[in-house]
């Protein structure tokens, strides 16, 4: 642990597994005060068992009221790392309206809601960083069998640039 992030307060969404978990651990190992959120109680409990100094909080990132209540518990946030995501497999012809809506709710709307809720804290403290995880499926080369996933991750890029 280098301590480079000592005293920094970092929120990581979808921290129960994958990129979110690895990022929460990396920030913790650099000395940050990490709050790891996820919808899955078991993966959060496993993370907390392995890293008891990481604060874990169950949070449905698609529930704006839950997000607003969660943010009320925070005094400052130096970094928001939005890792929440869902991969729908299928082409445009295999994408139903409910697949489209669910994917946008998870991959775009949840990030918008987290950014909107946490940004006032960052403005109040005169700084902070927001990192929204996207994918090369959105820009470098389209993936026809991940039609809606690539579309939503393209929207994440636009969202992030527009903040």
Annotate each predicted stretch with a short phrase:
Residues 91-92, 96-104:
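Substrate-binding pocket helix/loop in short-chain dehydrogenase/reductase
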Residues 115, 152, 160:
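Active-site helix of classical SDR
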Residues 95, 142-150, 162:
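Active-site loop-to-helix junction immediately N-terminal to the catalytic Tyr of the SDR YXXXK motif
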Residues 58-69, 97:
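The beta1-alpha1 cofactor-binding region of Rossmann-like NAD(H)/NADP(H)-dependent oxidoreductases
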